[in-house]
């Protein structure tokens, strides 16, 4: 069996100094390793401080968190943002945070992959409890990988050489109004005092299950080791957390109403652009995609992204419920079905438009 020697960065080299084949795909973020290269990459940069201000949504977060806190007093609530999903090789799909996370932090758009919101129950004799609080919200995030660290150029997920200046602990606290902690502290924070102690000294943990499977598995293992051995009961408890969050979003606050109106206006503009594009698209080999592209460009100009993949279904594709390949030809005198919506931050619209296309002549 071949012997491998780990380097300071975790990659393994064979005895002859060559790299394992499966590690070669990561070369761009791991090598070279010399001190002179590190000095070159981390020195003489201009100011990399991101511009930070409180998000408009941050004014509405305390009320949302208070309602959540009152529903689950004395319990630790874990709400992940989710992890990036690989598209191919070392390239990820554009990140979109879980809706529950976005609702309770105000962080929409592409904030913040890997982050976790924890509602930490307060002790009865604490100052927070005396002030009427039942939880303290804590946002666990990755620190900035700026040019003072080697991760600046080695980490393609967080390194600011790769992704530009990003929000870290200080910045996300200013943006959300929520206290932040290093993500490295998360495991210990979640496991603290977890127990099914009959005397009421232990803490139950609930998690939004489907968002981050790896984190959910850790929570399940921790709960089982702490006496919460009924898997069905644990799942049911988690489902109640998700259910409450989903129902809470049914009643929109003023901020959400403004965002919905922005999304509606942007979606209307997108449909206008598609209809303007339609005459030139008729009969073209890629006409469904030409119309799709017209809408998607508005989604990026006026919002954050499309709320879901745009459906442009013409002729025989029109009866298909979720036709998103959009490979067909839009012909004259056929039924054209468009289902599209713009997402602004984390709220989006859904507009279904069935119509015959113009006939020739």
Feature names for model-found ranges:
Residues 305-316:
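Short, basic/aromatic beta-hairpin or loop at an interaction surface
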Residues 353-361:
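Single conserved hydrophobic/aromatic residue that forms the stacking wall/gate
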Residues 288-291, 314-319:
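Short acidic loop-to-helix transition motifs that present clustered carboxylates
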Residues 82, 315, 339-341, 352:
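Anionic group-transfer/hydrolysis microenvironments
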Residues 1-270:
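A composition/biophysics-driven feature that prefers long, compositionally simple stretches
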């Amino acid at each position: 069996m071949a012997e491998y020697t780990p380097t300071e960065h975790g990659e393994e080299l064979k005895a002859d100094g060559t790299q394992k084949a499966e590690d070669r795909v990561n070369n761009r973020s791991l090598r070279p390793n010399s001190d002179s290269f590190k000095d070159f990459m981390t020195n003489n940069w201009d100011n990399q401080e991101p511009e930070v201000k409180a998000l408009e949504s941050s004014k509405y977060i305390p009320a949302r968190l208070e309602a959540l806190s009152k529903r689950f007093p004395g319990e630790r609530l874990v709400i992940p943002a989710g992890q990036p999903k690989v598209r191919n090789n070392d390239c990820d799909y554009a990140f979109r945070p879980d809706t529950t996370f976005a609702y309770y932090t105000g962080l929409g758009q592409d904030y913040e992959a890997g982050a976790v919101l924890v509602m930490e129950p307060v002790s009865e004799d604490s100052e927070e409890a005396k002030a009427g609080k039942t939880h303290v919200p804590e946002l666990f995030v990755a620190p900035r990988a700026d040019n003072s660290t080697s991760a600046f150029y080695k980490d393609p997920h967080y390194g600011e050489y790769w992704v530009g200046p990003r929000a870290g602990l200080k910045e996300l606290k200013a943006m959300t109004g929520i206290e932040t902690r290093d993500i490295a502290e998360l495991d210990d924070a979640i496991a603290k005092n977890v127990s099914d102690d009959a005397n009421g000294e232990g803490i139950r943990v609930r998690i939004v299950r489907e968002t981050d499977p790896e984190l959910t598995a850790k929570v399940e293992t921790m709960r089982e080791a702490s006496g919460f051995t009924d898997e069905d009961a644990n799942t049911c408890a988690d489902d109640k957390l998700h259910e409450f969050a989903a129902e809470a979003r049914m009643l929109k606050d003023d901020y959400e109403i403004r965002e919905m109106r922005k999304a509606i206006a942007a979606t209307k503009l997108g449909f206008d652009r598609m209809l303007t594009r339609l005459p030139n698209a008729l009969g073209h080999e890629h006409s469904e995609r030409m119309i799709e592209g017209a809408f998607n460009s508005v989604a990026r100009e006026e919002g954050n992204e499309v709320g879901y993949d745009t459906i442009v279904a013409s002729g025989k594709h029109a009866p298909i419920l979720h036709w998103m390949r959009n490979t067909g030809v839009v012909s004259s005198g056929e039924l054209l079905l468009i289902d599209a919506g713009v997402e602004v931050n984390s709220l989006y619209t859904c507009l279904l438009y069935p119509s015959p296309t113009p006939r020739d002549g």
